[in-house]
């Protein structure tokens, strides 16, 4: 499956929630009504969605939110199953450890897609070493930084300013002057309030 390159607002409307695919500088809420589906008239049928349909939709929503394709998403789920604890929470924890997501959480990119681009363009280092793999899993204590030659990019400066206004997640510690941050720990499930029902994904893959 190829990566989706179409309108981001359309995806959020399809899932009925903000997937955080667009910068908060231009809120997607201004362009899409999440309670209506894509199309001229949205969904007209009041038919009940099957359990399988709900499970599949939840998986699609999380994949789109984190920008992960099916094969890789399945690998994350299998890895989550091997870890101790709740499989659904483990799955989200692994997704939160992706380098592109950590760059986004630290405010260096205004969206995960923008953060992924910074990683692929070699603008990001981990513990002083350049890393250009978006799926690289960041560990507790790792220092993630923007390379010196990229620190003055307008999009990075603006994204960081916005993140400072909104507030940083508790599991990262960011030095805005150095444009670097420390990934303190894998976040607990209750620390990020994403509109996700991960148990539906576990049920889907357990069928």
UniProtKB/Swiss-Prot annotation:
PROSITE patterns: RIBOSOMAL_S4 (PS00632), S4 (PS50889). GO terms for molecular function: rRNA binding; structural constituent of ribosome. InterPro entries: Ribosomal_uS4, Ribosomal_uS4_bac-type, Ribosomal_uS4_CS, Ribosomal_uS4_N, S4_RNA-bd, S4_RNA-bd_sf. Gene3D superfamilies: Ribosomal Protein S4 Delta 41, Chain A, domain 1 (1.10.1050.10), RNA-binding S4 domain (3.10.290.10). Residues 97-157 form the S4 RNA-binding domain. Belongs to the universal ribosomal protein uS4 family. NCBIfam families: PRK05327.1 (NF003717), rpsD_bact (TIGR01017). Part of the 30S ribosomal subunit. Contacts protein S5. The interaction surface between S4 and S5 is involved in control of translational fidelity. This is Small ribosomal subunit protein uS4. It comes from Acidovorax ebreus (strain TPSY) (Diaphorobacter sp. (strain TPSY)). The lineage of its organism: Bacteria, Pseudomonadati, Pseudomonadota, Betaproteobacteria, Burkholderiales. The gene is rpsD.
